[in-house]
Amino acid sequence: MMTGSTKNAAKTALIVDDSAVIRKVARRILETLDFSVRDAEDGATALAMCAEAMPTVILLDWNMPNMDGYEVLRRLRQSPLGDRPKVLFCTTENDVGAIARALHAGADEYIMKPFDREIMMAKLDQVGFAVRPSEAA
C-alpha cells in the first residue's frame, strides 16, 4: 500500500475519457510534468488496466457511455487491488451538486475541462504530487 506522501513515488497516470482529444491534451500536460501516462476510452478498460498495474493518479471523466466515472470510482474504492490511486474527476459541468457527489464518492479532487496546465499542476500538488514542469515544457 502507498503510505505517506506521493511526492517521492513514481508518477504514473491513467487518463479515462471517451474523448480522444481530451486524452491527447491531458497526456501532453502530464508528460511535461514527468508522468508516465496510459489512457483508456471507457471504464471497463480502465478497470482492467488498473488490475494490471495501478497508477498513482487517475484522471476520470464522469460522463462516459456504458460505465460512468462514478461506477469506475466505486469499484476502485471497493477493490483490494493494493495501492489507492489519487483520483481527479474531470468534468465540463460547473455543477456544485455533481462535484460534491464525486468528492463524496471518493474522488480526491476535481478538475474542469478543457484542461489548463497551471490548474492541473495545482490540483496535482493538492493531492500530494510535487509537480515541476520538465525543461521541454
Predicted regions and their residues:
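Short hydrophobic/Thr-rich beta-strand motif most characteristic of the beta2 strand and flanking loop
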Residues: 34-41, 49
